Amino acid sequence: MKVIFTQDVRGRGKRGQVKDVPDGYAQNYLIKRGLAKEATKGNMNTLKRVEANEKAAYEAEKAEAERIKAELEKDDTIVEFKSKAGNDSRLFGSISSKKIVEGLEKQYGIKVDKRKLNLPEPIKTLGYTNVHAKLFKGVEATVRVHVTEQD
């Protein structure tokens, strides 16, 4: 019996895959537990539509990530912060990824999720810092952050 897997089944198939499995296994285990459904013409058409929608959503998300990368990679895109600092250029406080995201949105209107920024520890010194951002699978950018001393 041909079935369409609705979930990953270890050793049998992945979600969205169409496979031929024994009738008893399909009816008594896979279909009963909702792990698969019978591969009828209607279900096959539904599968094709769902795959097309998922691919379109993936392409749209990747295009959006490419657009954001182009904005971030421009020479004039530098996130500016003013902060109080001591004599040794150490900040009183720090600049976290949350503040960087807020600065990007406020200064340039670019929305980026803070979890996409690779900032191992908050910025605690004056000057320029490059922060890497993984926007999408295979799409990475660098956010330039400039921290100056507040008067």
From Swiss-Prot:
Recorded GO CC terms: ribonucleoprotein complex; ribosome
Any one GO BP annotation for this protein: translation
HAMAP family: Ribosomal_bL9
Xref: PROSITE patterns: RIBOSOMAL_L9
Cited Pfam families: Ribosomal_L9_C, Ribosomal_L9_N
Summary of the function given for this chain in its UniProt record: Binds to the 23S rRNA.
Protein's UniProt name: Large ribosomal subunit protein bL9
GO molecular function: rRNA binding; structural constituent of ribosome
Keywords: Ribonucleoprotein, Ribosomal protein, RNA-binding, rRNA-binding
Highest taxon listed in the record's lineage: Bacteria
Name of the gene encoding the protein in the UniProt record: rplI
Family of the protein in this entry: Belongs to the bacterial ribosomal protein bL9 family.
